[in-house]
Each structure stands twice: as C-alpha cells, then as structure tokens.
C-alpha cells in the first residue's frame, strides 16, 4: 500500500503540533508504525507526524536506513546546542524537488519520551543532530525551504497561511 505524504504547499504543514498524551492509545501506537513504513517507503531518514496528517509532537528517525526499527521521539525538546554549526543543503519528503540551505548545530542534547513514556536525555551529533533539528522544525510548522542563506526567514514563513486548531488530523480539514 502506497502511503501518501502531506506535501508543500499544503498549509497543514504550517500547523503547530500538539503534545502527545500518555499512556499511548492504540491509535497512536498504530500511527508510529505507519510513520515508520512511510519513512522507509519514501526513502527518508526521518518523518514527523504532521507529514502523514497528524498534529502530534513526535517523529521517527533512522539515519542508518537499517529498516529494522527506527528511533521514536515523542514530545521532544532540544535542551542544549553546541556553539558550532554548519550550513548545508537539505531536502524534505514533503517538498520533493526543493532544497533549502540550512544552518544547523552539529551537536544537540534532546529530552524526549519513548513509546512507554520514559523520559530520555541523549546527545546526538552530525547527521542525526541535523535530522532531529529538521524534524523539530516540522513540529513548529517550519520547512527547510523557509531558510534564507542558512537562516530562518520569519517573513517567508509568515507569508504562508497558518492553520489553528486543537489536535486535528489532515482528514478533519
């Protein structure tokens, strides 16, 4: 079964994502598996819930593309960033054929919950750190193509119509 992603310029991608309540219900557990399948099917290394139509603060990641079991990040928060950063081009599964030049920290420390609700604090480097920052942007309604010469452009972001709602899904729109 082919999994369709929400694609730019759909304004749903500009939505802020909502906190995921614990314990996870069956629907959310199925959504995590669905997100993983979608990420692998589209040959990505990360995928946020908003990209499959859910305004939830979670994403999956597998920078090694092992296709075994991706890491699951629920209610993530970056709590520490390195001073060092690097600017590079990024693509996005929700914006095929488009790329943005994005400045990212090379090391971040992330606080998040796993599928059991356990709080985890872990430091990530290089590609994993870049991927996490990219997916975190999705949770805030930002896309890599919103960056101008490596820096986030508020004007470019504001030019998109923002969607306000509580915990809605793409199918509710």
Residue map of PLM features:
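Positively charged
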Residues: 1-173
């Amino acid at each position: 079964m082919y999994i369709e992603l929400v694609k730019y310029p759909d304004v749903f991608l500009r939505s802020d994502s909502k906190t995921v309540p614990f314990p996870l219900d069956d629907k959310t557990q199925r959504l995590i598996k669905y997100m993983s399948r979608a990420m692998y099917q589209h040959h990505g290394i990360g995928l946020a819930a908003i990209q499959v139509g859910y305004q939830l603060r979670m994403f999956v990641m597998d920078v090694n593309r092992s296709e075994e079991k991706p890491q699951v990040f629920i209610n993530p928060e970056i709590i520490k960033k390195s001073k060092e950063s690097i600017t590079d081009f990024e693509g996005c599964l929700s914006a095929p054929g488009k790329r943005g030049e994005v400045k990212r920290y090379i090391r971040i420390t992330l606080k998040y919950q796993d599928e059991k609700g356990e709080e985890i604090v872990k430091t990530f480097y290089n590609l994993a750190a870049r991927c996490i920052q990219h997916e975190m942007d999705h949770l805030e309604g930002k896309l890599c193509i919103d960056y101008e010469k490596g820096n986030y452009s508020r004007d470019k972001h504001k030019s998109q119509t923002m969607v306000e709602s509580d915990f809605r899904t793409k199918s509710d729109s």
